[in-house]
């Protein structure tokens, strides 16, 4: 019975807590790209390159 007031107070504190946006923001409030997007973009750039000069395996890899 002693725990009920503590439980109610905790519920009220949790309900009144401000929500937190998990996305990173700039000072202009624009979302920043995630590291996953940066990695994906970097891999796409390397994948789109034609052949590596002097290395035939790279050309075969691009055909996959």
From Swiss-Prot:
Expressed by the venom duct. It is found in: Secreted. GO terms for cellular component: extracellular region. The modification 4-carboxyglutamate is found at residue 60. InterPro entries: T-conotoxin. Keywords: Cleavage on pair of basic residues, Disulfide bond, Gamma-carboxyglutamic acid, Secreted, Signal, Toxin. Residues 1-19 form the signal peptide. The cysteine framework is V (CC-CC). This is Conotoxin mr5.1a. It comes from Conus marmoreus.
